[in-house]
């Protein structure tokens, strides 16, 4: 489900895939070949969420922001099932493990494993 919020509509590349019951709200950009899986929520209501090319956000994960803390996910990143990512930066090629929590202001480098 795709929702406009405060006159901001998610921008989803036509080569991306979003599960029918995933929720994407507001200022969210999905680059090409991204995938958002079942029950994931991307809530760009406070700041922008940017998901880089080839990245995936798996089942039940939540991506959110706070004022002053946008969320940037690099290219070819995997966000595992039920992860909570909030107002952070995740570098290219990183893996955020199942159930991981990353909070405001965290900066994860390229090729990292968070678990």
What do the predicted segments below correspond to?
Residues 1-16:
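Extreme N-terminal tail/first-helix region
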Residues 14, 19-20, 25-26, 31-32, ...:
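Left-handed beta-helix
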